[in-house]
Every structure is written in C-alpha cells, then in structure tokens.
C-alpha cells in the first residue's frame, strides 16, 4: 500500500516505488485518494504517477472528509480516462446525486445512505 505521507513530504520516487511493489503482486489494485487531504499539485502528481504505473481503478474520497464537488469530479475525469474505473465516496445522500455522478462518467459510488437512495428508486 503506498504511503501518502511520502507523497505529502514530496518523496515522489518512494511513493511511486510503493505503488510498483503493490502492482507487482498481481492482485487487483484500487488507489484510494482523499483529495481533501492533498494540495492540488500533489493530488495531480499522485494521479499522474498512478496512471504511468498502470493503475486502472481509482476511488476518490473515503467518507471521512468533505464531499467531492462537481468541479473536482470534472477535473478528475479530465485527468483519468473514462475507460478507467472511478469510484466516488462521501457525501452522496440522494438519487439525483447518484444519477449526476453516473451521467458525468463515474463508474461507481460508495455511500452509507444506500437504504434511503434505494427507497427513492422504489418510489419512482
């Protein structure tokens, strides 16, 4: 598992080597990034390094920070091809948010509000 402390301390090479080690394990790898805990430069660098090393599955947010804004989603989609798996987590509370995320090109959402969202679907 890459240590984001290395990234935050600008130990970019170490961060990249840690991703390579995990990638070589031949198990499916999803890189989980909480963009609210990284400045924009490091956030972009983490994505660039991950893409260069062949990471194809990303999760943005961990449910413990602020929700990811639509502006953030747009920026993420510009950096990462829609061919990659992109999951957004945190702050997703209703069906319209889920639909908007899927319409924008997000692959998957994570929410603890599944029951409420499913109830909205049932009432349609």
What do these predicted ranges mean?
Residues 38-49, 75-86, 92-108:
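Catalytic cores of alpha/beta
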Residues 11-30, 34, 67-94:
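Alpha-helix-loop-beta-strand connector modules within alpha/beta enzyme cores
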Residues 1-61:
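Conserved anion-binding
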Residues 1-9, 53-69, 91-93, 102-124:
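Glycine-rich phosphate-binding active-site loops on the catalytic face of alpha/beta enzymes
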């Amino acid at each position: 598992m890459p240590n984001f402390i290395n990234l935050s301390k600008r130990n970019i090479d170490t961060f990249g080597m840690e991703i390579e080690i995990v990638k070589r394990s031949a198990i499916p790898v999803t890189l989980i990034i909480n963009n609210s805990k990284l400045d924009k430069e490091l956030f972009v660098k983490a994505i660039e390094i991950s893409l260069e090393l062949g990471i194809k599955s990303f999760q943005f947010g961990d449910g413990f920070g602020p929700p990811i804004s639509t502006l953030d989603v747009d920026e993420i989609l510009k950096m990462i091809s829609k061919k990659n798996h992109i999951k957004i987590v945190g702050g997703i509370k209703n069906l319209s948010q889920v639909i908007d995320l899927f319409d924008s090109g997000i692959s998957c959402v994570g929410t603890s509000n599944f029951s409420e969202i499913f109830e909205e679907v049932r009432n349609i």
